[in-house]
Amino acid sequence: LHAHPSPQLRRQHDTLTEDLDLSYRAQLAGWRFLFLSDVEVPGEIPVEINGFKSQQHRWTKGAVQVAKKLLFRIWRSDAAVKAKVEATFHLTANICYILMLLMALLTLPVLNIRTHLGWERLLIIDLPLFSFATMAISGFYLASQRALYPEWKRQIKLLPMLMAMGMSLCINNTRAVIEGWIGYETPFLRTPKYGVTNATHAPHKPLYSSRRTVLALGELGMAAYFAYALYQAWHTELYMGLPFLLLFLTGFLYTGLLSSTQEWLSRMRSEPQPI
């Protein structure tokens, strides 16, 4: 497709996620894709936390760029309405990071309001809301693990940390969403591959230092914020919110500390060469 004679199917460089852009343009041009669940494509998540955040920033911003570029064309196309709706949800899903950050920042004000409400209102409003949100995310990841691994039940214990890590990305990815919507251009930063297969291998030299300190300070600041919120919830006996607050605290603390200290830790290990 990159060398296709049609201009609509040639490689274009106006988004950070060219594969996502091209796949949507191909479908708009009449191509149909077949998903083969038994075909696996090897992948590697960056072993550096700052590399991981850089990758997530690129994917998030790229999806927003594709949404700006193609959503109007998608809705003007002859595709089925359900396909248009699904494409809209798919391409705009990252807006949730802005909402997640706002929700995080409003935690203390909400806790203060909740102290004046009875437990009956907490059961009616908070419990169903948090339960459905948690069940939706958990169900999505459990379904993927069940499809990938025969012993998928072993992965359940990793779900809380996975959710905490996802929450901690809200600062990093909110910036990506805003940059994508306002048209702020940034270069494509390739994620180095090291062929890492176990925890004893990690890159010696840090590869992602840009804005690392500012983001890490923001994440550590949010960790301190949620530590205080956790204390307030315990002090005011709002015990139902403790697991939710603990997830945010764990995620921000882990990501912030690792972003700040991985450069020092990596120097204590051997350096594999990028592939």
Label each PLM-derived region with a short phrase.
Residues 76-99, 195-227:
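Loop-to-transmembrane boundary segments
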